[in-house]
Every structure is written in structure tokens, then in C-alpha cells.
Amino acid sequence: MAASQTSQTVASHVPFADLCSTLERIQKSKGRAEKIRHFREFLDSWRKFHDALHKNHKDVTDSFYPAMRLILPQLERERMAYGIKETMLAKLYIELLNLPRDGKDALKLLNYRTPTGTHGDAGDFAMIAYFVLKPRCLQKGSLTIQQVNDLLDSIASNNSAKRKDLIKKSLLQLITQSSALEQKWLIRMIIKDLKLGVSQQTIFSVFHNDAAELHNVTTDLEKVCRQLHDPSVGLSDISITLFSAFKPMLAAIADIEHIEKDMKHQSFYIETKLDGERMQMHKDGDVYKYFSRNGYNYTDQFGASPTEGSLTPFIHNAFKADIQICILDGEMMAYNPNTQTFMQKGTKFDIKRMVEDSDLQTCYCVFDVLMVNNKKLGHETLRKRYEILSSIFTPIPGRIEIVQKTQAHTKNEVIDALNEAIDKREEGIMVKQPLSIYKPDKRGEGWLKIKPEYVSGLMDELDILIVGGYWGKGSRGGMMSHFLCAVAEKPPPGEKPSVFHTLSRVGSGCTMKELYDLGLKLAKYWKPFHRKAPPSSILCGTEKPEVYIEPCNSVIVQIKAAEIVPSDMYKTGCTLRFPRIEKIRDDKEWHECMTLDDLEQLRGKASGKLASKHLYIGGDDEPQEKKRKAAPKMKKVIGIIEHLKAPNLTNVNKISNIFEDVEFCVMSGTDSQPKPDLENRIAEFGGYIVQNPGPDTYCVIAGSENIRVKNIILSNKHDVVKPAWLLECFKTKSFVPWQPRFMIHMCPSTKEHFAREYDCYGDSYFIDTDLNQLKEVFSGIKNSNEQTPEEMASLIADLEYRYSWDCSPLSMFRRHTVYLDSYAVINDLSTKNEGTRLAIKALELRFHGAKVVSCLAEGVSHVIIGEDHSRVADFKAFRRTFKRKFKILKESWVTDSIDKCELQEENQYLI
């Protein structure tokens, strides 16, 4: 019965294509009602099929879960991470589809966030992949929902095992058996962003009235789908249960001015706001489980029993003898026993992955209790829960502690507590109503939080320069969604800064309108960032932008952040925690941004915390903060960088008209002919000089490929020519036609012309070649290293494995190197026994992919023995001298494998 149930599921019958077409209709529908109708139709048909399939069975576990986990992939908890993002998917598609790396489609996938002006899909990788895949895929796929889930399970488990080869194999199966439309939705499921235009709350409400509430207290999608399969049957008691993760209660941001009103003019509790990881602990005797605020299981890290983990062994004996079962809510902190202090989360450690030999130890700071000995406490008041909490365990400093609280009545007490938190470099404070009950996944139902950055004027703000950008995704597609900001190296007195160190990436704080306007302002200045040739004026750490902007064309933004924390991702060696843009400093010039010295001073001021000011009560009893003086604005000095100045050609005498009305842009010259000399000579021959190439520029002259030249090459709008061509023109006093040897880069039209005139090595089809030109052509021809048959065999094997052709019978021996016992004396070729069956076997082995050798040496994988076993002992003696041990098999292994079209188990044929 159990076997039949597992094989007979709705998911194993419903085509994945049906789910995708439903999702497509939901996405394309305009109104909410129409979106709901399409989802309800799919859900109803599933339930009807379920009833028909299982009409003779009771207590079946089959449910809507296989489809729901694909519709709401962001709520998936059973499946581990895929380890796949858009860029990795792009590279896999390019490899699996064998797309030319520099081809149009490959570049579309790799640069999916870059606006192209077509389709309007910038930032939507799934849509871009759809258009690339459409001409290459099936019209309709053959996979069921169950098969898709199985393959996704395989990808997740192989990612955990770091088996990239098996991940590729599963992805290849998905690609070859699904249509472009199905893959579009599959990509969105893997990335966990379906863009349906309908919330998870709406999906839950259509599925069942109790679904959202049950998910809040269990975070278990499968349990929701199983328990609420019948929409007519509700749950009488939806409450927190042991060993089932729930979404914790959250705090809303408080307005200090209204704090007494929010607390209903009654007394309230003030607690320290801890800067750790929110974690719930479930305990039943010696069994423990730990869950994060999003329902992820961290039991392996903290310990499932008193004998394992970074926490459980140290706190198990702290619980009172009469406490068998409990559920606690608190913050997991890192504690330094040497300094007896808690570490802030911004420093370089991860409490969820701390190793045993760390100088820090895990400490659980508990502030709530939800169950004790099977008694549920969620509906008890906070005051009552606090009383119970104090009787559950004996605190152990640095291991398990109760978060201390103070009782308060007034706004002034809140301000004093906040100022004290600022002095102690703490994150902030919590304010809680004593009569509040615990409401999972609810924010602000009696719990409030106050952090210095929420209060105007308490934070030191940073004026930093935008130096890079990142294209947006989703609703921000086609515009810059994040910016890379930097501080300046302090320049010599009287000069402007020329080098900038990256500090932080920032994207929040801006409205869509502000983001759009800022992007529009900087749009014409963005340039592609090339990792191998970065701009010399912008120094980066490991974090690199997608595009950059010359500092002199950029703007300063005022940033507010919680603190400055260490980071090797940025050149400054630190970054900002929780940065957000406050405003654009239109009143400041680009060179007036913060310097490295300013940053170091601010960093040392309050241990990196950017809140160092106190909140004060003014005369009108309203919170006030001290105003800071605005920095005096420096007078603008307008000038042109020296190397961009136009040359002074007033004293040049014209000697020829060969370049009359021809515009040149000279980027650089040679050692013997520097840039000014070339410009003077061009003017002598009647040409015009510009410092930046435009639509009328005939060509760009470059003696070396600096950053400006590389950017011109990337634009693909201008021909870039060596100074040697100019010198040839000057020497002959004629307009010498271009030849391949003169060219650094050709724009498309020139490239097309050259393709008609020259072969790929630069040899003209029509003009006679002299000896020197022929030598030059030959020097440009690289030797093609022909591969040996052995190397080709290895290459073929890799290709067969990559594209799953290795299951073909014709390649079954491809990775085998075989020696056949055809010689009376091993390795003596003159003693070959002619006309034996083994000679035929050698041909069959080669036909089916094997490499057959006549010399027994290191690297042989198999030795095949015929009827004569007299040399077996000699072969075994040989084998003992080899690093890699070969297998000695009967010839029937070859015969049986070929007859049955697959490799047979070798152990049955061993000699």
C-alpha cells in the first residue's frame, strides 16, 4: 500500500507544462480577481484529480505540496540551496548549448542586466533566456511536476556535496526535456522570484482560509498543504507546536514623541536591542532543535543533544529538573570570554557558522518563552511569560542568559535608555507592553524598537562619491539600482583628489523617481568596468562594479549608516553597515567628498559606531539634537586637465593638403614621435585635431592601448590605427591605404571591407606581396598544435559526458586503456600470437571507444586474458610495481558488455 501511494501521486501525472501555462496566465492577467481565478482553476482541477486518484485509499499523504513549493519557492525549507544564481545559469546555458562565448546570445545572457532597448526585459534573466532558448528548444516539454521536483532535489543535494558535474547533468536533463516557456518559469523557481504580481498571502487565502496563519506558526509548507487539503475543513487550534518552526513576533519602529501614547499611557518594559541572530530553541528532554526567524534549521550548528554542537553541551544542565519541554525565543550572540563582552554582528564572524577553535563562544540570550511542559503560553501576557521565564533555567554568563528589562513610564526614561545604549555602542532599545500577547509574524503588536539611525540628527553622515553602478533587476530593470561609493585620497595642498578608494555599495533610501532621476543625470558618463583593465583613479577591493564613472563627472551622496565595520571587499578595508542614501549633495563639487583621513577619524571616534550624539529634551519638551555647522563651500575652480587640452597650432605652417578636411583624434604617440609631434605633423598636412572622437572623426591614432583607447575599442564606433600609418603618409606625402598591419581595431564597416580584401592572416587577395610583407604575414600565423588520437579520445570522452552521450554503447569503453594478452612475452612485440580471438577483441574494443595499447605501462586500466592463463602471475607481479593498479579480466567481459550494450560489473570477471 505504501509503495502504491508513493508512486500514485497527482504530481506524477500532472505535466509541468500545465503549471507553467497557468503561471503565464496569472502573470499576464491585469486585475487581482483574474489572477485569483486562474490559480483557483488549477487548484480545483488538482483537488478533483486527487479525489479520483485516491478514492479507494484513506489517510493518503499526497497533497498540493509538489506544486505549491514551485509556486512559492521562497518559502521552500525542505530542499537545500541550489547554489545557482543568474550569472552561473548564464554560463551553464552557454556551455550546455555550445553558444559562442562572444556571440550575441551568450552576451545577452551574461549581460542580462544591461539595457538593450529591445523587449524591455533588462534585469529579467528568465525573459532574456526565454528569447535565447525559444528557437533551440522543444515546443512542449515531457516532464511532470514530480520529475521537475526530483531533478531540483538532485541539484540541491549535489550542490551541498559540491558535485558540479552532477548539477550540470541534472540541468541538462531539464533543458533537453522542456520548452523555452517551461525553462523561463524553471529559472524563476530556481532564483526563487516568480514575478506573478500576486502575494503569497493571496495564494494562501485561495488555498485555504487558515493557510497563512498555519504557515506563520509552522513555516512548514508541506504541513500546510497536507493538513488543509480540504478547503471545507478548518483547524480548531492553530498555535505554536514543539519542534515546528514558527515566524517570530517582530517589533515596529517607534516614534519617541508618541511612545507614551503607543504604550496606552501605562508602564512598559525597556530592554537592550541585541545585535545577533534571532533564534528559537525547542527542547524535549535531551532533544534540542534551533530555528532562525525564517524557519531555517540550525540544529547541526548549535547541537541536537547535550553531546554535540556549539551551545547545547554548555546549557543542558542549566535547565531546572522539572523542565522537560520548553520553547524559548531569543537572540544568538557571540561572546568574548576574555573581554566578557558581546560581539556586534557587523564584525567578521557568523554566529551560525562559528568553529570550535574560535576565540568566541555562542551565548543564547533569551527574552521570551512560548511553551513549558506542554503548556502553551502564546496567549499569556508578556508580564506572565517573563515571570515563568525566570523559573526555567539558571543563567550561565556567556552561555545562556535572560535579557534584562527595566520598567518605565515616561518618554524621558526612553530617551535616557537610548542615550545609554549609544554610550555602550549597543544597537538600540526595545519597548514592550506588559499586557501584550505573542502573535507570530506580527509586527508592532505591543513591541517597538528604537535605534539611533531612526532618530534624526543622532548619526554622523558621510558625504561620499559615486564611482560605480549596478544594473537593476525586476521593477528596477534598465536603471542603476545600486551604486558603489568611495572616499578620496587626500591630495597635495591646492590640488584636487585623483585617486579614490571604494567604501560601500548602497541602493536603499531612494524612491524609484529619485533613482531614475539620478540615473538619468549620470547616464551619459557610465563606462563598462573591465576587471583586467580597471580605471587607475578608482581602487577596488574584491567588490567590483558593472559600470564606472570618472570621478570628475560624478556626484556626492549623503549616506546614513549604523556603523563602520571591517571588510576586505572594499579598498578602504572597511564598509558601512545598513547604508542608505539620505540625499544627493548638489551643493558640493565632486572633489569635496570625504577623504581617507576623515574616514579613519570617524572610525576611531566611537569604535566604528556612527551614533555618538545624545538626544536632548528641548524647552518645549520635544526631543532635540545639537545642530552641526555646515562645512564652508569651497569656491569652484574651473579648468581642463592638461592632457585633454587642445594643442596650440597657431605657429604651424601647412606643407600639404593630403589630410584636408580630415579629422583625427590622437590618443598617444610613440617614444620617437610623441602625441604633440604627431598633432603638429597632421596640421602641417591639412588635418584637423580633436581631443575626443566624434561622429566626424576619420580615425583614432594610438601608440599604446591605455584605458581611454580600450574604452574607444569597446564602443566599436571608431577605427584605431597605429602611428606607423601616419608616418608612412608623412614619408610618401600621400594618403596611404590602410593595411591590416596598421590596424589596432576596426569598426564593423572597416572590418567588412578588409574581409573582402584580405584573408584572415592579412594577405591581400588582389595586391602583389613583397618579401617583407610575406614575412610579416607568416609571423602572424600561429602553429596549430594538432592533437594526437589519444588527446582526441580524452576530448571526445569529455564531450560525451558533458552532453550525456556517454550512455551510448559505441562509447562504453571510452575511458578505458586496455592491454590484451596477445604476446608470449609481456611487452615484447616480436612475440605476438597472431590469429587469436584476442585480436578480434582488440578491434571490437577500439570500435566501442577503448584505447588499446601494445605495451603494459603506467596508465593501463584493464588487462584482458584469453584462454591461456599462464601469464596471470606475471601480470600480477607487474601490477605490484604500478602506482595505479589495473584490473585483470576474462575476455568474456568484453563479449558480454558488447552483447548487452552496456558495461558489465567487473567483479564477476576478475582473475
Swiss-Prot record:
<comment type="similarity">
    <text>Belongs to the ATP-dependent DNA ligase family.</text>
</comment>
<dbReference type="GO" id="GO:0000781">
    <property type="term" value="C:chromosome, telomeric region"/>
</dbReference>
<comment type="function">
    <text>DNA ligase involved in DNA non-homologous end joining (NHEJ); required for double-strand break (DSB) repair and V(D)J recombination. Catalyzes the NHEJ ligation step of the broken DNA during DSB repair by resealing the DNA breaks after the gap filling is completed. Joins single-strand breaks in a double-stranded polydeoxynucleotide in an ATP-dependent reaction. LIG4 is mechanistically flexible: it can ligate nicks as well as compatible DNA overhangs alone, while in the presence of XRCC4, it can ligate ends with 2-nucleotides (nt) microhomology and 1-nt gaps.</text>
</comment>
<keyword id="KW-0677">Repeat</keyword>
<dbReference type="GO" id="GO:0045190">
    <property type="term" value="P:isotype switching"/>
</dbReference>
<dbReference type="Pfam" id="PF01068">
    <property type="entry name" value="DNA_ligase_A_M"/>
</dbReference>
<dbReference type="GO" id="GO:0051402">
    <property type="term" value="P:neuron apoptotic process"/>
</dbReference>
<dbReference type="GO" id="GO:0006302">
    <property type="term" value="P:double-strand break repair"/>
</dbReference>
<dbReference type="GO" id="GO:0000287">
    <property type="term" value="F:magnesium ion binding"/>
</dbReference>
<dbReference type="GO" id="GO:2001252">
    <property type="term" value="P:positive regulation of chromosome organization"/>
</dbReference>
<dbReference type="GO" id="GO:0032807">
    <property type="term" value="C:DNA ligase IV complex"/>
</dbReference>
<dbReference type="InterPro" id="IPR001357">
    <property type="entry name" value="BRCT_dom"/>
</dbReference>
<dbReference type="InterPro" id="IPR044125">
    <property type="entry name" value="Adenylation_DNA_ligase_IV"/>
</dbReference>
<feature type="binding site">
    <location>
        <position position="367"/>
    </location>
    <ligand>
        <name>ATP</name>
    </ligand>
</feature>
<dbReference type="InterPro" id="IPR012308">
    <property type="entry name" value="DNA_ligase_ATP-dep_N"/>
</dbReference>
<feature type="binding site">
    <location>
        <position position="449"/>
    </location>
    <ligand>
        <name>ATP</name>
    </ligand>
</feature>
<dbReference type="InterPro" id="IPR016059">
    <property type="entry name" value="DNA_ligase_ATP-dep_CS"/>
</dbReference>
<dbReference type="GO" id="GO:0033153">
    <property type="term" value="P:T cell receptor V(D)J recombination"/>
</dbReference>
<comment type="subunit">
    <text>Interacts with XRCC4; the LIG4-XRCC4 subcomplex has a 1:2 stoichiometry and XRCC4 is required for LIG4 stability. Component of the core long-range non-homologous end joining (NHEJ) complex (also named DNA-PK complex) composed of PRKDC, LIG4, XRCC4, XRCC6/Ku70, XRCC5/Ku86 and NHEJ1/XLF. Additional component of the NHEJ complex includes PAXX. Following autophosphorylation, PRKDC dissociates from DNA, leading to formation of the short-range NHEJ complex, composed of LIG4, XRCC4, XRCC6/Ku70, XRCC5/Ku86 and NHEJ1/XLF. Interacts with DCLRE1C; the interaction is direct. Interacts with APLF.</text>
</comment>
<dbReference type="Pfam" id="PF00533">
    <property type="entry name" value="BRCT"/>
</dbReference>
<dbReference type="GO" id="GO:0071285">
    <property type="term" value="P:cellular response to lithium ion"/>
</dbReference>
<feature type="binding site">
    <location>
        <position position="427"/>
    </location>
    <ligand>
        <name>ATP</name>
    </ligand>
</feature>
<dbReference type="InterPro" id="IPR012310">
    <property type="entry name" value="DNA_ligase_ATP-dep_cent"/>
</dbReference>
<feature type="binding site">
    <location>
        <position position="432"/>
    </location>
    <ligand>
        <name>ATP</name>
    </ligand>
</feature>
<keyword id="KW-0436">Ligase</keyword>
<feature type="binding site">
    <location>
        <position position="451"/>
    </location>
    <ligand>
        <name>ATP</name>
    </ligand>
</feature>
<keyword id="KW-0234">DNA repair</keyword>
<dbReference type="GO" id="GO:0035019">
    <property type="term" value="P:somatic stem cell population maintenance"/>
</dbReference>
<dbReference type="GO" id="GO:0071479">
    <property type="term" value="P:cellular response to ionizing radiation"/>
</dbReference>
<dbReference type="GO" id="GO:0005958">
    <property type="term" value="C:DNA-dependent protein kinase-DNA ligase 4 complex"/>
</dbReference>
<dbReference type="GO" id="GO:0071897">
    <property type="term" value="P:DNA biosynthetic process"/>
</dbReference>
<dbReference type="GO" id="GO:0000793">
    <property type="term" value="C:condensed chromosome"/>
</dbReference>
<dbReference type="GO" id="GO:0043231">
    <property type="term" value="C:intracellular membrane-bounded organelle"/>
</dbReference>
<keyword id="KW-0539">Nucleus</keyword>
<dbReference type="Pfam" id="PF04679">
    <property type="entry name" value="DNA_ligase_A_C"/>
</dbReference>
<keyword id="KW-0132">Cell division</keyword>
<feature type="domain" description="BRCT 2">
    <location>
        <begin position="808"/>
        <end position="911"/>
    </location>
</feature>
<dbReference type="GO" id="GO:1904155">
    <property type="term" value="P:DN2 thymocyte differentiation"/>
</dbReference>
<feature type="binding site">
    <location>
        <position position="331"/>
    </location>
    <ligand>
        <name>Mg(2+) 1</name>
    </ligand>
</feature>
<dbReference type="Pfam" id="PF04675">
    <property type="entry name" value="DNA_ligase_A_N"/>
</dbReference>
<dbReference type="InterPro" id="IPR036599">
    <property type="entry name" value="DNA_ligase_N_sf"/>
</dbReference>
<dbReference type="InterPro" id="IPR000977">
    <property type="entry name" value="DNA_ligase_ATP-dep"/>
</dbReference>
